[in-house]
Curated annotation (Swiss-Prot):
Disulfide bonds: none
Originating species: Dictyostelium discoideum (Social amoeba)
InterPro entries named in the record: Asn/Gln-tRNA_amidoTrfase_suB/E, Asn/Gln-tRNA_Trfase_suB/E_cat, Asn/Gln_amidotransferase, Asn/Gln_tRNA_amidoTrase-B-like, GatB, GatB_Yqey_C_2, Gln-tRNA_amidoTrfase_suB_CS, Gln_synth/guanido_kin_cat_dom
Region forming the signal peptide: none
Protein's name in the database: Glutamyl-tRNA(Gln) amidotransferase subunit B, mitochondrial
Keywords: ATP-binding, Ligase, Mitochondrion, Nucleotide-binding, Protein biosynthesis
Enzyme class name: ligase
Known EC number: 6.3.5.-
Functional description taken from the UniProt entry: Allows the formation of correctly charged Gln-tRNA(Gln) through the transamidation of misacylated Glu-tRNA(Gln) in the mitochondria. The reaction takes place in the presence of glutamine and ATP through an activated gamma-phospho-Glu-tRNA(Gln).
Subunit field text: Subunit of the heterotrimeric GatCAB amidotransferase (AdT) complex, composed of A, B and C subunits.
């Protein structure tokens, strides 16, 4: 996710979606609860959604083999990262990757779940070309994590809690490729056997907005604690969604599963689309069939994939090749201590400690390295016995200018800029000092900041400014002469200004900045302009 998108998602309150077609739906809130209103009949319906998120564990090797976990890395030859275990060669036995266990524990602790000290692995049987074993190793009876919750903040300020049922460890499948041969489907097993955390929610969602918020928040949490890269565009985080609708105060409807959603936008759109389909069927006295469906992003409609299997169809039984997974309480406590500050705890602290707005704090915690840089800038200032810095100016540089530069240069990781010494805390605070001292204007400061970020010149901010002659002009006599001459040379604009056309004032400011190449002190120019324009008032 790029940095401008992070800002836009927060500005737009994250994925809020209302369908407005003639046979569509409208989100409504009644007594602090979300409902759907049919635009065709004006009847009120309740939407119920549950989500299964499959997030690849961030580990060097796969779940049960020593094959490289390629994750989102591109460029690997098909079937080049496959062991005998991954390909299900007879006699090849699985060996559990302990790092996958650690990542699942971290995830469970971060959502307030209970770590199951005794968990087991089961075999889930089904036949598909990219599942060479004929079964998936998963955890049905005793998953590694039980319980937990995630708090959502909705667009209208309401809080909504999503309960987590459990998290289970399981294998990812391979990939079926259908577009490389005109008559054959090909199989790539590089992904087969990568560790997955299946994070299963309760059916606590009652709007597509809640789902969008949840996906974004869970994705951010997994990245923050380092248990998964969770990049949906690379398939590192995929979602299955269960949807049903019913009239308020009646029994839940028949649920339909939407399979393998790989973008938050698609998930939200598919929920609205499927809700419309189900409501339309029910309003026409038809029944909902229990099935698995896909979503066509081009048409915006869901489509039938297959009849939904029951649990008995998978013939679950304990995996005889894997012993019980036993986790000591000491290990759980050690991992808990290593977790560090979680995003929501950080947000609350930033608001309290620095008097930040909810909006600014939310933006900062989107990237842990940005938040750390913000705090280090303040600490650096305090350690050098300087006066309290204007926090808003730091935020403007970080959340507006630096985010803008990162986005325009297609850089996803702010931390890489720091690691490559393009932007140090010292340079950043020096630049802020020069602006506060009036040595340069904010606009020139932005120019210098971008030069530093580009990494082409390692000189200090002041040396960069002086070498280009960009220091601010604060000479009263020089600016007085420029302003007086400008006003004298533009009598028509002066008349328009006194007729109430305030845009003309911007014209005068712009002309002065143009003549001084943006270096004139705006405060001095502003005072001089008012002085000479008032003198011309008849």
């Amino acid at each position: 996710m790029n940095y401008l998108n992070k800002i836009n998602k927060i500005n737009n309150k994250l994925f809020y979606s209302t369908t407005s077609s003639s046979n569509g739906i409208k989100n409504v809130v009644i007594n602090n609860k979300d409902y759907l209103k049919s635009l065709k009949t004006n009847e009120i319906w309740e939407l119920i959604v549950g989500i299964e998120v499959h997030a690849q564990t961030k580990t060097k090797e796969k779940l049960f083999s020593n094959s490289l976990n390629i994750g989102s890395m591109e460029g690997f030859k098909a079937n080049s990262r496959v062991s005998f275990v991954d390909a299900a060669f007879p006699g090849a036995l699985p060996v559990l990757n302990d790092k996958c266990v650690e990542q699942a524990i971290k995830t469970g602790l971060s959502i307030g779940g209970t770590i199951n000290r005794y968990s087991f692995f089961d075999r889930k049987h089904y036949f598909y070309q990219d599942l060479p074993q004929g079964y998936q190793i998963t955890q049905l009876t005793e998953p590694i994590v039980k319980g937990g919750s995630i708090e959502l903040e909705l667009s209208d300020g309401r809080q909504h809690q999503i309960r987590i049922s459990h998290i289970q460890l399981e294998q990812d499948s391979g990939k079926s490729i259908h577009d490389l041969h005109p008559t054959k489907s090909l199989v790539d097993l590089n992904r087969a056997g990568i560790g997955l955390m299946e994070i299963v929610s309760h059916a606590d969602f009652t709007s597509s907005e809640q789902v969008g918020c949840y996906i974004q928040k869970l994705q951010h949490l997994l990245k923050h604690i380092g248990s998964s890269d969770a990049n949906m565009q690379f398939g590192e985080m995929r979602c299955d969604v269960n949807i049903s609708v019913h009239k308020p105060n009646t029994e839940f409807g028949t649920r339909v599963e939407l399979k393998n959603m790989i973008s938050a936008k698609a998930i939200v759109s598919s929920i609205d689309s499927e809700a419309i389909r189900q409501i339309d069927l029910l309003e026409n006295q038809n029944k909902i069939q229990r099935e698995t469906r896909g979503f066509n992003q081009e048409t915006g409609e869901t489509y039938h994939l297959r009849t939904k299997e029951d649990e008995v169809d998978y013939r679950f039984f304990p995996d005889p090749d894997l012993p019980p997974l036993i986790i000591s309480s000491e290990r759980i406590e050690t991992i808990k201590q290593q977790l560090g500050e979680l995003p929501q705890d950080m947000k609350k602290r930033l608001i309290k400690q620095y008097s930040l707005t909810n909006y600014d704090a939310e933006l900062l915690i989107q990237d842990q390295s940005i938040a750390k840089f913000f705090e280090n800038s303040i600490i650096f200032n305090q350690n050098h016995n300087q006066k309290q810095r204007d926090i808003k100016k730091i935020l403007n540089f970080l959340l507006r200018d630096i985010f803008s530069w990162l986005n325009s240069n297609n850089i996803q990781d702010f931390n890489s800029i720091i690691n490559e010494n393009q932007l140090s805390i010292e340079k950043f605070t020096q630049l802020l000092d020069l602006i506060e001292q009036g040595y340069i204007s904010s606009n020139i400061g932005k120019t210098i900041l971008f030069q530093i970020l580009n990494g082409s010149d390692n000189r200090s901010p002041k040396d960069l400014i002086d070498s280009q002659g960009l220091s601010q002009i604060s000479d009263d006599s020089l600016l007085d002469q420029l302003v007086q001459q400008l006003v004298e040379n533009h009598p028509n604009e002066v008349t328009e200004y006194h007729q109430g056309k305030q845009r003309v004032y911007k014209f005068f400011m712009g002309e002065i900045m143009k003549k001084t190449k943006g270096r004139s002190n705006p405060e001095i120019v502003n005072n001089l302009l008012k002085k000479y324009l008032d003198l011309k008032k008849k």
